[in-house]
Amino acid sequence: MANLKRIRDRIKAVKNTRKITEAMRLVAAARVRRAQEQVMATRPFADRLAQVFYRLQTRLRLEDVDLPLLKQRPIETVGLLVVAGDRGLCGAYNANVIKRTEERVRELQETGQQVRLYLVGRKAVQYFQRRSAPIAKTYVNLSQIPTAAEAAQIGDELLSAFLSEKVDKVELIYTRFVSLISSRPVVQSLLPLDPTRLAARDDEIFNLLVRGGEFTVERSKIVAAVSAPPPDMIFEQDPVQILDALLPLYLNNQLLRALQEAAASELAARMTAMSNASDNATELIRTLGLAYNKARQAAITQEILEVVAGAEAL
């Protein structure tokens, strides 16, 4: 009987755990949807910004533009902006970002370059603090869905470090959102900006859908409307001055998109992890149920044998 009670208690505990993991899966799905809506909300601004940059490039194509954010200089120190998460229970999401960061740090150090780390997310901060890494700045407890203000704060500090020559180059390491079951850490160069890549084409957005009772994601191409700038776009000021003022805005927009992609990747990883945990809990409950039934049948059989043996003794 003690064995039966132990199995019943374990089944109850696993069922309670399954309720938690299923709730976390649904919460993550809702937040992925919110992240998707935020990406869509920022698209008109990003498209218009691309149009302005394209027109400015057209005007300045034959000029030698000398702007601080476009200036290439010998690279002695590289700043790495690493975007991880504040929480766990999201599979290998944080571990993959940290692993890619360590690989990139080794690559840079092998070429004789120094590294300064700008860390987003408590998991990355804790990991690199334990290893006495060269941490320049940390950002923790950001919003579940990144905001433009948070991206601007990070962007301003990176700009300050670059313009003051504390770093000669800034790279971004974040997890690119591919699908609910697939994501990959990527390394992207942020500073100095490349004027040939300002008007980005073939951008992508993701759409969270429900098919057959399961969540799925579709990615679709967004071609920025930069090939035909509006004819009424007239620059009253010097185009160089306008470009100089808009470059920080462009950088902040790139950071916001990266933070949004990383947040969506983390939420998708958490959805997948919690879905797998729920499935494993269901299978464990089934296995424990079979074990409980076998133990109960064995107990009943034993009781019958004892009754029969007692009757024969009389």
Curated annotation (Swiss-Prot):
It is a peripheral membrane protein. Keywords: ATP synthesis, CF(1), Hydrogen ion transport, Ion transport, Membrane, Thylakoid, Transport. Coiled coil: none annotated. One of its GO terms (molecular function) is ATP binding. Signal peptide: none annotated. One of its GO terms (cellular component) is plasma membrane-derived thylakoid membrane. Its main location: membrane. It holds the Pfam family ATP-synt. It is found in: Cellular thylakoid membrane. Produces ATP from ADP in the presence of a proton gradient across the membrane. The gamma chain is believed to be important in regulating ATPase activity and the flow of protons through the CF(0) complex. HAMAP family: ATP_synth_gamma_bact. Belongs to the ATPase gamma chain family. PANTHER family: ATP SYNTHASE GAMMA CHAIN (PTHR11693), ATP SYNTHASE GAMMA CHAIN, CHLOROPLASTIC (PTHR11693:SF41). NCBIfam families: ATPsyn_F1gamma, PRK05621.1-2. F-type ATPases have 2 components, CF(1) - the catalytic core - and CF(0) - the membrane proton channel. CF(1) has five subunits: alpha(3), beta(3), gamma(1), delta(1), epsilon(1). CF(0) has three main subunits: a, b and c. This is ATP synthase gamma chain. It comes from Synechococcus sp. (strain JA-3-3Ab). The gene is atpG.
